[in-house]
Each structure stands twice: as structure tokens, then as C-alpha cells.
Amino acid sequence: MTIFEGTFTQDPSTLRFAIVIGRFNDLVTDKLLAGCQDCLKRHGIDVNPHGTQVDYVWVPGSFEVPLVARQLALSGNYDAIICLGAIIRGHTPHFDYVAAEAAKGIAAVGFQTGTPVVFGILTTDTMQQALERAGIKSNLGWNYALNALEMASLMGQLRGQVTPNNSQASLPVSQMKNPMISE
């Protein structure tokens, strides 16, 4: 029996990512992006905006993220797409509509295109909760990037582009720790 699990044995220079960032609540999304970039960089990805491995796309808010993610996925140029945003509950039902449609839209992009699309949109009740998840206590941007790395590796294996790693030399993604979380 073959076991497939995302690993980091693939040459990182062959991977390409797109990061779609909602500008609304940029106090939060800027921090998520920094965590994302830190993780990718530590795993050998060139995060320079003028480089060839990561493309950055800014959109007005989380509602617009799925449309742009779909267009990027359809290009076939990316091993994974990371979607970042922050939706903070207010006093109207607007939060519920935006959060639900962003989640459904991002999931649909992955299903329709076969490209891994990471849901990195925070949905919180308060700005404080969002900031805690974007850097005060931990930075979930790191986790979203790690998810993208794992899924890019896993989908590569499932597509037959990369053979599963049976050696003990590499650490499976499930055993990696996020250095940005204070325990």
C-alpha cells in the first residue's frame, strides 16, 4: 500500500504560488501576509514580489477573493493559491453573507480547477480576535502557507509528478511546528 502525504522533499525552486489578499481590514491582512511570507521563505520559496515564485494580487475585500483565485487557478501557473482576508462581525448581517460566500467561493475554486486553494480568511467577532490570530498570539498566515506547501506536494504526488517519499530523512508536514506560535 502506498501512503501519500505532503512533504518538503520536492525542490522548492519548482513551486509557484499566488497569494490573493483582501485589502479591507489591512491592519490584519498585512500581518497574515507577513506570516505567510515568513513560512514560505523558511521553506526555500523566493517571496520577492519581483521574483518568479510568488505572485501577489490585492483585491478590495474578502468577497472579491474567490473570483480572482479562480482566474489564477484557471491559468494553470500555480501549484497552490493562498487566499487571505479578515471579516469582522459588525451589527448587521453583512458579516454572515460575506463570510459564507467567500468560503463557498474559495472551496468551489479548488473543486472546479483541481488547484489547491487555501482558505486563509479570518472570520472573527472582534478586531482583537483577528489581531490575536494574525500575530499577537500566533500568526495563522504561517499555517496557511504551510497548508499550501503541503497541498502542493500532495497534489503533485497524486498527479504522478512526484513520487511518494518513503525515507525517514524528511519530516512529514504533520510533524512540523510553527515557530510563530508561543506555547
UniProtKB/Swiss-Prot annotation:
Pathway: Cofactor biosynthesis; riboflavin biosynthesis; riboflavin from 2-hydroxy-3-oxobutyl phosphate and 5-amino-6-(D-ribitylamino)uracil: step 1/2. Keywords: Riboflavin biosynthesis, Transferase. SUPFAM superfamilies: Lumazine synthase. GO terms for biological process: riboflavin biosynthetic process. It catalyses: (2S)-2-hydroxy-3-oxobutyl phosphate + 5-amino-6-(D-ribitylamino)uracil = 6,7-dimethyl-8-(1-D-ribityl)lumazine + phosphate + 2 H2O + H(+). GO terms for molecular function: 6,7-dimethyl-8-ribityllumazine synthase activity. The active site is at 94 (proton donor). It holds the Pfam family DMRL_synthase. Its EC number is 2.5.1.78. 5-amino-6-(D-ribitylamino)uracil binds at residues 24, 62-64, 86-88, 119. One of its GO terms (cellular component) is riboflavin synthase complex. CDD domains: Lumazine_synthase-I. It is an enzyme of class 2 (transferase). (2S)-2-hydroxy-3-oxobutyl phosphate binds at residue 133. PANTHER family: 6,7-DIMETHYL-8-RIBITYLLUMAZINE SYNTHASE, 6,7-DIMETHYL-8-RIBITYLLUMAZINE SYNTHASE DMRL SYNTHASE LUMAZINE SYNTHASE. Belongs to the DMRL synthase family. Catalyzes the formation of 6,7-dimethyl-8-ribityllumazine by condensation of 5-amino-6-(D-ribitylamino)uracil with 3,4-dihydroxy-2-butanone 4-phosphate. This is the penultimate step in the biosynthesis of riboflavin. This is 6,7-dimethyl-8-ribityllumazine synthase. It comes from Crocosphaera subtropica (strain ATCC 51142 / BH68) (Cyanothece sp. (strain ATCC 51142)). The gene is ribH.
